[in-house]
């Protein structure tokens, strides 16, 4: 049957082929499911909170829908812009990173909440600078790796230069303080440099340096160590340092195999702080149970897997910059989602860290969707082989 004889409203084969060449359908489907699930869970976890503080049951849900719309619009923009423009803009992206991280610390510019200065007010919106910084760092490092590929693999200075940038950014994040954001940014950078071929002994030396620094902090400020290790036994002080974690564990344990059902969480009723934000996973586990948690993890796994696959396709097509972009986004989303789940389950210290796609918050949701749009652009360009390779193909470790 010819495409012209298709029933009205059905897409032609040519249009479907065009869609497959423009976007990665498995990634699109998984991201869309996570976004929809996030909107549902924000509504479920925040209804009572919105009614109490704003007189509007749907306050947080409505704002999250607005953030999602903005994020989807910006994701479309990221998808439409050729990667070559972002590659050329590398130095400007680095400047923007530093401007954001310094500006938020300036009196009268940054907004302080609960002792942390992490936000820049922009109208009705509060920009949490750590979120765009993650994406900008991925974009900058992808360009750096392409420009200095040989130096990164063969010379120490090629490894040290991006470390100086990451170190300076980490210090600025710690001054806010934002320990979670600093850890994520540093880990993204280390992961991208490792995949680019930096030598193992360099990472070993860096790890030893970090260990010495942590030991110094433990000796100089033991109270900080006590706060960080409170997660090891939250029941020792369940009404102070261990309160949030104990409530999270109660929520997760109450879910059982199949959960209490959507909207039936008890812990979200002002027992669990940040139930709609950093600890949304605990509410999800309570309402959907162990089976729901497995499904959620599977969706995140699909997103990360497709980002890695797209990175490999881009590498084979000779698009080195796009390849490192996709790998960087994969590292970022995998690490942040895993750390958020670990914090909710008491495997890591409690630190402010959102769950991508799900947690309430405009900065996180918008930037996450922009990152997906960027990876979709990598997929789109990977369909056409590059006229020349920007860098040699990655070699396996140990090869000359």
From Swiss-Prot:
It is an enzyme of class 2 (transferase). It catalyses: [GlcNAc-(1->4)-Mur2Ac(oyl-L-Ala-gamma-D-Glu-L-Lys-D-Ala-D-Ala)](n)-di-trans,octa-cis-undecaprenyl diphosphate + beta-D-GlcNAc-(1->4)-Mur2Ac(oyl-L-Ala-gamma-D-Glu-L-Lys-D-Ala-D-Ala)-di-trans,octa-cis-undecaprenyl diphosphate = [GlcNAc-(1->4)-Mur2Ac(oyl-L-Ala-gamma-D-Glu-L-Lys-D-Ala-D-Ala)](n+1)-di-trans,octa-cis-undecaprenyl diphosphate + di-trans,octa-cis-undecaprenyl diphosphate + H(+). GO terms for biological process: cell wall organization; FtsZ-dependent cytokinesis; peptidoglycan biosynthetic process; regulation of cell shape. InterPro entries: Cell_cycle_FtsW-rel_CS, FtsW, FtsW/RodA. Residues 1-24, 85-88, 140-153, 199, 300-324, 376-400 are cytoplasmic. Peptidoglycan polymerase that is essential for cell division. This is Probable peptidoglycan glycosyltransferase FtsW. The gene is ftsW.
């Amino acid at each position: 049957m010819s495409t012209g004889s298709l029933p009205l409203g059905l897409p032609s084969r040519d249009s479907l082929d065009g869609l497959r060449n423009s976007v990665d359908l498995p990634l699109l489907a998984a991201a869309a499911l996570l976004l929809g699930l996030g909107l549902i869970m924000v509504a479920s976890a925040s209804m009572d909170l919105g009614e109490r503080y704003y007189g509007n049951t749907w306050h947080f849900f409505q704002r999250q829908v607005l953030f999602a719309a903005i994020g989807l619009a910006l994701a479309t923009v990221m998808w439409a812009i050729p990667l070559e423009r972002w590659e050329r803009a590398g130095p400007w992206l680095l400047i923007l990173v530093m401007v954001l991280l310094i500006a938020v610390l300036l009196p009268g510019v940054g907004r302080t909440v609960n002792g942390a200065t992490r936000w820049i007010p922009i109208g009705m919106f509060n920009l949490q600078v750590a979120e765009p910084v993650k994406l900008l760092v991925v974009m900058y490092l992808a360009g750096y790796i392409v420009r200095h590929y040989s130096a990164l693999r063969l010379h120490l200075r090629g490894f040290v230069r991006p470390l100086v940038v990451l170190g300076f950014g980490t210090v600025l994040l710690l001054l806010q303080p934002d320990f979670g954001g600093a850890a994520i940014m540093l880990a993204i950078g280390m992961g991208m440099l490792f995949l680019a071929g930096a030598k193992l002994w360099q990472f070993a030396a860096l790890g030893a340096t970090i260990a010495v620094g942590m030991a110094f902090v433990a000796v100089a400020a033991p109270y900080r160590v006590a706060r960080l290790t409170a997660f090891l036994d939250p029941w020792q002080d369940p009404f102070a340092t261990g309160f949030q974690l104990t409530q999270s564990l109660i929520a997760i344990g109450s879910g059982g195999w199949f959960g209490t059902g959507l909207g039936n969480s008890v812990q979200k009723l002002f027992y669990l702080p940040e139930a709609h934000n950093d600890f949304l996973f605990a509410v999800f586990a309570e309402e959907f149970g162990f089976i729901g948690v497995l499904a959620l993890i599977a969706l995140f796994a699909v997103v990360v897997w497709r980002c890695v696959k797209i990175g490999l396709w881009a590498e084979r097509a000779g698009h080195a910059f796009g390849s490192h972009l996709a790998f960087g986004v994969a590292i970022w989303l995998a690490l942040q989602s895993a750390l958020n789940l670990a914090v909710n389950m008491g495997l890591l210290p409690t630190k402010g860290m959102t769950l991508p796609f799900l947690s309430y918050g405009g900065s996180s949701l918008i930037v996450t969707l922009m990152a997906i749009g960027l990876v979709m652009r990598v997929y789109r360009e990977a369909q056409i082989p590059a006229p020349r390779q920007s860098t040699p193909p990655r070699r396996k470790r140990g090869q000359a």
